[in-house]
Amino acid sequence: MYELKKLNLKQSEKYMTYKCNEYGKHYKKFSRIIPVVVIITLVAAFLVPAQAKVIYALGVAITAGLFFMVYSYYKQMVSLKEVPSIPCEYVVTPVKYNERVQLKTTKGEDLLFAFVEKSRSIYKNEKEALIIYVPESGHVYGEHVALLKDIKG
């Protein structure tokens, strides 16, 4: 029987970063392109002084578009990292494929039996970990636990 362990902030941030990985990739990519666009704009305006105004206008437009994209991805990442509707976040580790797990709250109360359908490595170079959300009622619902199939036990 596994006991639920409360996640510390560092683990929680790592997991949420994993969860919104796609937004993070785009955010990093576009935020790194902005200085490159600024440098290219300045170099191009220096090399072709006759077209400097047009080059500056294009550079400003592209940079503004990139800033808007970076801001929108950042906003989406922050919205994913906000506190979930389920008040408690716990981790069960290690978890193996097809392992039947009985969950126990930190207060010692037994929860439903759960069967691990899939197992994924959330943290690189660490053991398998399963993140679950447990509401105050103590019931684990499938919509909150993507990797668990509830078994009434």
Segments from the language model and where they lie:
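Beta-strand/loop nucleic-acid-binding surfaces
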Residues: 109-122
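Exposed beta-strand and adjacent loop surfaces of beta-rich binding modules
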Residues: 98-100, 128
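A membrane-cytosol interface segment of integral membrane proteins
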Residues: 123-153
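Alpha-helical transmembrane spans
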Residues: 19-82
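N-terminal compositionally biased, intrinsically disordered segments and leader/signal-like regions
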Residues: 94, 106-107
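Structural detector for short beta-strands of small beta-barrel domains
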Residues: 80-98
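Cytosolic juxtamembrane N-terminal segments of multi-pass membrane proteins
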Residues: 1-28
